[in-house]
Curated annotation (Swiss-Prot):
Modified-residue entries (Phosphoserine), positions: 66
Gene: pex5
Residue span of motif WxxxF/Y motif 2: 112-116
Positions annotated as TPR repeat: 328-361, 438-471, 472-505, 507-539
Taxonomic lineage from the root: Eukaryota, Fungi, Dikarya, Ascomycota, Taphrinomycotina
Keyword vocabulary terms for this entry: Cytoplasm, Peroxisome, Phosphoprotein, Protein transport, Repeat, Thioester bond, TPR repeat, Translocation, Transport, Ubl conjugation
GO biological process: protein import into peroxisome matrix, docking
UniProt source species: Schizosaccharomyces pombe (strain 972 / ATCC 24843) (Fission yeast)
Protein name (Swiss-Prot/TrEMBL): Peroxisomal targeting signal receptor
Compartments in which it is found: Cytoplasm, Cytosol; Peroxisome matrix
GO MF annotation list: peroxisome matrix targeting signal-1 binding
Length: 598
């Protein structure tokens, strides 16, 4: 299993610079898709005799004044001259048999069960059931016999006479079968996903197929979801849907979990995947409402300077760029804050807006390169790195030209090696002049990371940290490189340095969780994930639906499912849930102490 912290935590198998991947494990299944879907909140075990659509249609046929199949709006009427008889079971058995016998004459088949199956076939293959206002025609039953119009009388007797007693007997037998199927459905259909999974685990155990590793456990879970036609991610449905439907049927869900004050807003926000930040702020953020004429950018900078909530600062900066789209500093800081929060897509958007306003700010190009790497957009990342190195060291343009001659063929592999030569050459020239640049070392570290040379990447970041020991972002990059180099203990030390410099660095906490998962410390992983969620999920902001929050919850569910093998805790973990309640549940389960934000 591969787990990545931050952007696209579980859906993207590629390793990322400011995020890390669980090592010594296989690539994650594509089952865990990134976008939100409304999934079923309740899963029924499949019926073995009839499909669910057939079963529903048959039950409707039995009911009083019920149409055949869910798509039919009105009961079927048989027009015979001036008389209309409705094909329902509302009248006597004799009347029903009489009407059915009349219908049967239109069909070349005499067996009731055969005709019943053919009606289901037609109902599933076409939409003619929707047009029952039209005169009933023979083609409706898929047979090439008479073609009836609304004024054609249906003969009440036929050469293919049916034994009405036998027909009634068959109908009664079918009714008994239907009732039995309904009871079986009630017995199995009300089971939650967790209960079905527990039963499946018992079956695997009895068959001697218990998982020997976390990877096997994960694969069995995904196979179970697929075989039961359960949504890839059954817990990412909107909170209100989960509360109204799942809570009614799942005894494992405690109502206290819905105590979070902003639960009502999450439903609408979770469906807005584009421009989610700017759309949410003006209607749901108390932070903006409380400004009372104060410049939101000034207030945001005060929060950042004094160690206030960075999620609140993000909301204020979003408001600032909304009021003044030409505010360069607001866009620049918005990109930096979302870097801390782990919202890569918004980082790119903000930095691109800043570059439009000031293309001479080369530091933005380096930051953009990192974000592109995190989104596996290596071509764009290389463009940013080349722009940075060429414009930062114009005195070496002739040297860059000579390097270009060695890489005439244009492809991504050559471009990456060419950029490596650019940065190595500059680093060498600086060393000859007894100089060094932390930016050059950081850029070289990014390139080594893209080449998957993680130990060399870590060496570059260590060199950069000699000049910038208080740069929490560099410490996080060092930790990411070490994690992917399978040096998780060293990585945790780097992450701890980053957290000590910026306690609200969400990406660091999620990366720390990954290293703890690699080390088998699932309690610590859960602790850091919950702490990261608390930073984002502030009841006074509308950040609950941002991408990093959704990904943190997704990773937390995996920790509970795979590390703790607790489907109960996993089912209670989704954006908007009450983290204090989950901590209490976890404490009861493991004797694990609650965690305060550092």
């Amino acid at each position: 299993m591969s787990v990545e912290a931050g952007c696209s935590t579980l859906s993207n198998p590629l390793k990322k610079l400011t995020s890390t991947a669980v090592v010594n494990n296989s690539t994650p299944s594509a089952q865990y898709r990134k976008h939100l879907t409304k999934s079923q909140s309740r899963t029924y075990a499949p019926l073995q005799t009839l499909s669910e659509d057939q079963f529903t249609s048959f039950k409707n046929l039995q009911g009083n004044n019920s149409p055949l199949g869910n798509v039919v709006k009105n009961p079927v009427s048989l027009k015979t001259g001036n008389h209309t008889g409705t094909t329902t079971r509302g009248g006597s058995k004799e009347n029903w048999v009489h009407s059915f016998s009349s219908l049967q004459q239109q069909n070349s088949k005499s067996a009731w069960t055969s005709e019943f199956s053919e009606v289901f076939l037609n109902s599933s293959e076409n939409d003619r059931f929707r047009n029952l206002n039209q005169p009933l025609k023979q083609s409706f039953f898929g047979s090439a016999g008479l073609n009836l119009s609304s004024n054609t009388e249906i003969p009440l007797q036929s050469s293919l006479a049916i034994d009405e007693t036998e027909l009634a007997k068959k109908f009664e037998e079918a009714s008994q079968i239907s009732n039995k199927l309904e009871k079986e459905k009630d017995a199995t259909g009300s089971k939650s996903i967790e209960e079905l999974w527990e039963e499946h685990q018992k079956q695997l155990k009895n068959a001697g197929l218990e998982p020997a590793s976390l990877e096997e456990y994960q694969k069995q879970w995904e196979d179970f979801l697929k075989s039961n036609n359960i949504s890839d991610d059954p817990y990412t449905s909107s909170v209100n849907s989960f509360a109204n439907d799942n809570l009614a049927h799942n005894k494992n869900i405690d109502p206290q979990i819905f105590q979070h004050s902003d639960t009502d807003n999450v439903v609408e926000n979770s469906l807005q995947t584009e421009d989610v930040y700017s759309q949410n702020q003006d209607e749901s953020s108390e932070v903006v409402k409380e400004l009372n004429g104060i410049d939101p950018f000034v207030e945001a900078m005060n929060l950042i300077k004094n160690g206030g909530s960075i999620s609140k600062a993000a909301v204020l900066l979003e408001q600032s760029v909304k009021e003044n789209p030409q505010h360069f500093e607001a866009w620049k800081w918005l990109g930096r804050i979302h870097t801390l929060l782990g919202n890569e897509s918004r980082v790119v958007e903000a930095l691109l807006e800043a570059v439009k306003l000031d293309s001479t700010n080369l530091d933005l190009m380096m930051d953009l390169a990192v974000s592109y790497v995190n989104q596996s957009l290596n071509v764009q990342a290389l463009v940013c790195l080349e722009d940075w190195i060429v414009n930062s060291f114009p005195q070496y343009r002739n040297r860059f030209a000579k390097i270009n001659e060695r890489f005439e063929e244009k492809d991504s592999a050559n471009d990456l090696l060419k950029m490596q030569m650019y940065f190595l050459d500059v680093a060498y020239e600086l060393s000859l002049a007894k100089k060094r640049s932390s930016k050059v070392q950081a850029g070289l570290g990014i390139i080594m990371y893209m080449l998957k040379e993680y130990e060399r990447s870590a060496d570059c970041f260590r060199q950069a940290l000699q000049d910038e020991p208080s740069n929490e972002i560099l410490w996080n990059k060092l930790g990411a490189a070490l994690t992917n180099a399978e040096k998780n203990t060293e990585a945790v030390s780097s992450y701890n340095r980053a957290v000590s410099l910026q306690p609200q660095y969400v990406r660091v906490r999620s990366n720390m969780a990954v290293s703890n998962i690699n080390l088998g410390y699932f309690e610590d992983a859960a602790k850091h994930l919950l702490a990261a969620i608390d930073i984002i999920q502030n009841s006074s902001t509308s950040m609950e639906s941002c991408e990093s929050n959704e990904e943190l919850w997704e990773m937390l569910r995996k920790v509970f499912l795979i590390g703790f093998q607790s489907t109960d805790l996993a089912s209670q973990s989704y954006p908007g849930a009450n983290t204090s309640y989950i901590r209490a549940q976890l404490s009861d389960l493991q004797g694990w102490p609650g965690v305060e934000l550092e």
